[in-house]
């Protein structure tokens, strides 16, 4: 490679951008000496300097159109290419159906590509929130793509032919949380950056007042659920397992074969009794009516794409028990069993001869039953309309933040019965509710923080259970059997029960313990492992945690193991004292806690720094812990105002650049990262984050001020004279055009915006909406050159 370096004037090991490599290749082809193709080819593969910026969905996707040109331009000054990979719902659907599309329409499977990249030391991926699609969302995306000329097959609700089963399997590979388990080849480190936390204390968000007479509570099962039925084993050796259902008549049905497991891996099996679930739900509907509180259910039908839609269907049928008693056979025959929500039932009634009669029965049940919590009071959308509308990790903190209230049909706040059927984690929310009822709302101006170290690598625990979750077709016994024929786990089950198995590999557990010790050491905070002694899985994890803690120097550290309820109480007691506590949790509580505490502390989980140190040495940088904000898109379409806050992107980008500097020895990347952190802090302190109201600063204006601040910081820093020289005129040009550019961003607001699509927006139209200032665009494009 020396001749290439001699020719280019670069030192050996310097990261080289794509444009430079293309230039060298062209010169080689023109016969220039000193650039042997063999060596150039090696250099192209070996020193690829790039950051992958994911294209996702909804509000983060729209923000990407505005922010990514800035990121590309600034990163290029350090020789770093920023490349896009499309892992949007639309992109993932298209990647599964190449054989249905024209050659020009076909797209690569970017998710599979990134999954492989995440297992290499070179990985540097910025991951924005994406849709975890429910069936209604899948159908809407498919219909939109079909309208755009893609010859996709319809989503088959009840596949019967081999072709329909194949189509359904392809769509199901995209459904639910299909993205994160593929990319998360490491454990999770999520925390509020100091600048963000300080800003939240200085400018506290609104918290609803709690009353000691509040009737809000969580309702959860006390037996026969996933928590109480769990059995768990630690594998003594590598093995291949089979999951089968042995019927009452002795017939065997294989539910899952060729399940490869490793020595030290924790394997669990458990089930939810459908009969017990129905009894529990009937009691809660009656309780809500008697107590005069809103009835609501809080599940995660997106991530838990097999089990939770079934649970949601049970809730719908329990609330409308009289309707299903009378019309259940007809509704089930039409595929309207409640699992896709009330909206899908209402839409399907149009095709039934007595649809109006059944609709009247639903209306009567709504009028006579307990009041339902509303997703949108103005539009009459209830908590039971769409499974993906109410997601527990976001909906419960929002309720707690709003005095324990949800919204009723009149658009008023009201106390709520929050039904969370499985009791594994419900106690966390009840503990916080009880504390708020006794001591009042938390104070964001003084409260401490609860960062999280989460076990999630290699599809750990429940979030990797989808391919091992089954709605049991007949009474019998589910057995998990090893290759020698020994039964490791078994459960007596009944038709309709939901049975699932989980896997948690040993290497991720060891890495999780190491990360917890590291974060406790670096932060000086106590760390609590949230493990439930009543759960078989958690008892096994406790044994392993105690074992692996001995591998680390924990002298002077405060590391303990407590049940989730006890850990919650200790953490919130410390929060009220202004003290900080790391929560070290499994995969589900990682998800729940990184919404619960940030929403209480900061008002949103989108402002969290979310780093995944990949086990192979690369880095995955997630932009906050929030979702993809469909209501933000709705507002943009209606009045051309995008209130999405890209703070999560700013934080992730800085960490990505810093990781690049450390792994590639790129000093310029470190300068960019430090300058970006200072620019972000200035943005917060000067109040240049997006407003919720049209006619005020939005996402685009916020991006302008981030760019201006970043350019100023780079122009005035003294660590890299080249960067200072590059950005001095950029900062000057941006400052001179500030009034013109920001006026443009305000002037376009107030009227509808045409994106040319929701799941698959038009590139041309969306660019026009998100980059309306030709002056700003010209300055950024000038940096690239």
Model-flagged regions — what are they?
Residues 49-313, 325-544, 548-560, 564-566, ...:
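Extended, well-ordered protein cores
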Residues 742-758:
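A glycine-biased, small/acidic residue-tolerant capping/turn segment at secondary-structure junctions
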Residues 4-6, 13, 20, 29:
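Short hydrophobic alpha-helical segments enriched in small aliphatic residues
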Residues 661, 680-684, 715, 735-738, ...:
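A structural signal for well-ordered alpha-helices, especially hydrophobic packing surfaces
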Residues 30-48:
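Short, Lys/Arg-enriched N-terminal segments with co-localized hydrophobic residues
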């Amino acid at each position: 490679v020396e001749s290439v370096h001699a020719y280019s004037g670069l030192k050996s090991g310097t990261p080289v951008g794509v444009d430079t490599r293309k230039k060298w290749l062209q010169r080689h082809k023109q016969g220039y000496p000193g650039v042997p193709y063999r060596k150039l080819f090696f250099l192209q593969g070996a020193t690829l300097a790039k950051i992958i910026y994911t294209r996702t969905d909804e509000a983060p996707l729209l923000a990407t159109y505005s922010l990514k040109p800035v990121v590309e331009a600034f990163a290029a000054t350090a020789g770093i290419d920023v490349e896009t990979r499309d892992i949007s719902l639309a992109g993932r659907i298209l990647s599964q159906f190449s054989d249905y599309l024209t050659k020009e329409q076909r797209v690569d499977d970017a998710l599979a590509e990134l999954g492989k990249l995440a297992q290499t030391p070179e990985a540097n991926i910025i991951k924005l929130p994406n849709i975890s699609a429910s069936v209604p969302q899948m159908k809407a995306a498919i219909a939109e793509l079909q309208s755009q000329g893609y010859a996709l097959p319809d989503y088959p609700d009840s596949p019967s032919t081999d072709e329909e089963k194949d189509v359904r399997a392809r769509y199901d590979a995209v459904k639910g949380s299909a993205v994160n388990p593929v990319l998360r080849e490491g454990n999770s480190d999520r925390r509020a950056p100091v600048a963000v936390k300080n800003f939240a204390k200085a400018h506290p968000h609104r918290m609803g007042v709690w009353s000691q007479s509040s009737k809000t509570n969580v309702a959860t099962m006390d037996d026969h659920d996933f928590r109480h039925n769990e059995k768990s084993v630690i594998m003594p050796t590598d093995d291949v397992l089979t999951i089968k259902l042995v019927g009452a008549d002795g017939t065997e049905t294989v539910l899952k074969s060729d399940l490869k497991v490793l020595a030290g891996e924790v394997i669990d099996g458990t089930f939810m009794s459908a009969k017990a679930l129905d009894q529990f739900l009937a009691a809660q509907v009656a309780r809500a009516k008697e107590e005069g509180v809103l009835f609501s259910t809080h599940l995660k039908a997106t991530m838990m794409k097999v089990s939770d839609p079934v649970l949601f269907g049970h809730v719908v049928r329990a609330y409308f028990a009289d309707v299903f008693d009378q019309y259940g056979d007809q509704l089930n025959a039409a595929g309207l069993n409640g699992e896709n929500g009330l909206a899908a039932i209402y839409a399907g009634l149009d095709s039934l001869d007595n649809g109006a009669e059944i609709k009247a029965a639903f209306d009567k049940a709504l009028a006579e039953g307990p009041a339902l919590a509303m997703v949108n009071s103005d539009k009459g959308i209830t908590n039971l309309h769409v499974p993906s509308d109410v997601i527990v990790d976001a909906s419960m903190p929002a309720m707690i933040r709003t005095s324990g209230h949800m919204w009723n049909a009149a658009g008023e706040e009201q106390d709520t019965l929050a039904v969370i059927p499985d009791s594994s984690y419900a106690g966390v929310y009840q503990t916080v509710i009880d504390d708020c009822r006794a001591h009042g709302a938390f104070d964001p101006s003084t409260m401490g923080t609860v960062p999280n170290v989460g076990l999630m690598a290699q599809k750990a625990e429940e979030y990797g259970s989808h391919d091992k979750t089954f709605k049991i077709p007949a009474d019998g016994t589910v057995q998990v059997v090893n290759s020698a024929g020994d039964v490791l786990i078994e459960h007596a089950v009944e038709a309709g029960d939901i049975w699932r198995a989980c896997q948690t590999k040993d290497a991720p557990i060891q890495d999780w313990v190491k990360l917890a010790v590291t974060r406790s050491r670096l932060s000086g905070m106590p760390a609590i492992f949230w493990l439930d002694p009543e759960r078989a899985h958690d008892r096994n994890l406790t044994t392993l945690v105690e074992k692996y803690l001995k591998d680390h120097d924990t002298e002077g550290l405060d590391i303990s193991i407590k049940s989730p309820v006890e850990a919650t109480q200790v953490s919130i007691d410390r929060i009220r004292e202004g003290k900080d506590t790391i929560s070290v949790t499994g995969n589900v509580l990682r998800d729940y806690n990184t919404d619960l505490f940030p929403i209480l502390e900061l008002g949103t989980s989108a402002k969290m720094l979310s780093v995944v140190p990949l086990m192979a040495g690369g880095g995955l940088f997630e932009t906050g812990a929030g979702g993809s904000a469909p209501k933000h898109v709705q507002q943009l379409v209606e009045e051309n105002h995008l209130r999405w806050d890209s703070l999560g992107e700013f934080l992730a980008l800085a960490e990505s650049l810093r990781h690049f500097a450390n792994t590639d020895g790129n000093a310029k990347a470190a300068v960019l990262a430090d300058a970006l952190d200072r620019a972000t802090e200035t943005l917060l302190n000067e109040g240049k984050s997006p407003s919720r109201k049209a006619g005020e600063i939005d996402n685009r204006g916020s991006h302008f001020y981030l760019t201006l601040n970043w350019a100023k910081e780079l122009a005035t820093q003294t660590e890299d004279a080249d960067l200072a020289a590059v950005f001095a005129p950029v900062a000057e040009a941006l400052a001179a055009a500030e009034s013109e550019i920001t006026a443009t961003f305000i002037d376009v607001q107030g009227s509808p915006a045409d994106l040319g699509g929701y799941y698959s927006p038009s590139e041309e139209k969306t660019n026009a909406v998100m980059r309306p200032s030709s002056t700003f665009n010209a300055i950024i494009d000038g940096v690239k050159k």
